[in-house]
UniProtKB/Swiss-Prot annotation:
It comes from Invertebrate iridescent virus 6 (IIV-6). GO terms for biological process: regulation of viral transcription. Belongs to the IIV-6 282R family. This is Putative transcription factor 282R. Keywords: Activator, Transcription, Transcription regulation. Pfam families: A2L_zn_ribbon, Pox_VLTF3. Transcription activation. InterPro entries: Poxvirus_VLTF3 (IPR007031), VLTF-3_Zn_ribbon (IPR014900). The keyword Transit peptide does not apply.
Length: 383
């Protein structure tokens, strides 16, 4: 819970120091952005390089926009700070106030001070990132019923805000790792803990089965036609495909398969993110199939073996990497990729939404190799 008696002068100083440290990076951000914009002008860039550059560009643009927040923050908080100073500098005869029949003067000042603190915090929250809010201890809640929601979720990839939520399971939108938040409370008996753990094990299996279906584009889902239209518009705007009214050299309409020939699943995922369709990240392969006509892999013959392997792998994971307060599970798509390789199935690692950085890849490799070794399975590192 947020402390309503917090010293907002000290807090204001910390916030301004944060902004000033970011402003010092302004020139570096601008130089990097200019470099990326020049690289994006190069023709025939590989799709993955093109998408990585676009993501870096969006990140830097957001950083530069955030730098302008200092002036806006100062304008919005200046009056609040002034009122706060007036309150804390108000002279008060404590002895007289306490011995009088109407000690309302103290109460009124305390109330005004707390109201001013809350007003300041509300403004500050609108300008600060969630990690900074947490570091300043401004992420509290005001009700016991929200206790579970107040527990921060941080994925091992560093993501702390972009998740799909399925009951108490949080699925990272950046790397698909799964986290379950368990409230560590003495009111939960041992039987309840067992039930929660069993439910989590069951849910992990359901998510893995869903992942198998999604890899084959077999999930039952309803995708609004508008999403396809907007994706096509983005692909045209970024010169990845020709406009729908473009003709070939003989004056004939260009076929759908030819128009979308170079469109990859990475393109689809990137533009789903850009358009804000987070709920459809898991439908990337199905959407790609619908747009391009390129059939996804069929792994029905391996499904039973994959599910059996997954049971063994998760059991071993819980034994070796158990966490009392929060249970994390490695990226489900990465697990599917490695289990397919275990069975000699030739699959493309780029078709799996995994491992955004070398550090993340190394972490997953270490965990998976440990699990495979414990189970007597041959592990193959991903290059």
């Amino acid at each position: 819970m947020i402390n309503e008696d917090i010293d907002i002068l000290s807090l204001d100083n910390k916030i301004k120091l944060h902004f000033e440290s970011e402003i010092q990076k302004y020139k570096r951000y601008n130089e990097r952005l200019l470099c990326i914009e020049n690289l994006l002008k190069i023709e025939n860039l590989r799709p993955k390089i093109f998408l990585d550059l676009l993501m870096d560009k969006k990140y830097l643009e957001k950083k530069l926009v955030n730098l302008s927040n200092l002036d806006l923050y100062s304008i919005e908080t200046s009056d609040i700070i002034h009122r706060y100073l007036t309150i804390i500098n108000t002279p008060l005869n404590i002895e007289v106030a306490l011995t009088s029949q109407k000690p309302t003067e103290i109460n009124n000042l305390v109330l005004k001070r707390r109201e001013t603190v809350q007003e300041f915090i509300k403004v500050a929250k609108s300008y600060l990132t969630e990690p900074l809010l947490k570091s300043l201890q401004l992420m509290g809640n005001f009700g016991k019923e929200d206790l579970l929601n107040s527990i921060p979720v941080v994925c091992t990839c560093g993501n702390d805000k972009d998740f799909y939520k399925d009951d108490d399971i949080y699925i990272c939108q950046l790397c698909n790792a799964e986290t379950v938040k368990l409230l560590n409370s003495s009111s939960v008996n041992d039987g309840g803990r067992i039930n929660v753990c069993n439910k989590y094990t069951y849910d992990r299996k359901v998510h893995f089965k869903d992942c198998i279906n999604q890899y084959q584009g077999k999930q039952n889902t309803n995708i609004n036609p508008r999403i396809y239209d907007e994706l096509e518009e983005q692909l045209v705007n970024h010169q990845i495909i020709e406009p729908a009214n473009k003709k070939d050299k003989f004056g004939n309409p260009i076929s759908q398969s030819k128009r979308f020939k170079i469109v990859t699943r990475a393109h689809i995922l990137f533009f789903l993110k850009e358009l804000g369709y987070t709920k459809h990240y898991e439908d990337t392969i199905l959407i790609h199939y619908t747009l391009t006509g390129k059939r996804p892999d069929n792994i029905e013959h391996l499904e039973e073996k994959l599910m059996a392997d997954f049971d063994k792998l998760t059991e071993q994971y819980d034994l070796l990497f158990k966490d009392i307060e929060r249970k994390n599970f490695i990226n489900t798509q990465y697990v599917l990729f490695q289990l397919l390789r275990k069975h000699g199935y030739n699959c493309n690692k780029d078709d799996f939404a995994v491992l955004k950085t070398t550090e993340r890849k190394a972490c997953h490799d270490d965990i998976c190799k440990t699990l495979f070794d414990a189970l007597g399975w041959k592990y193959m590192f991903v290059m």
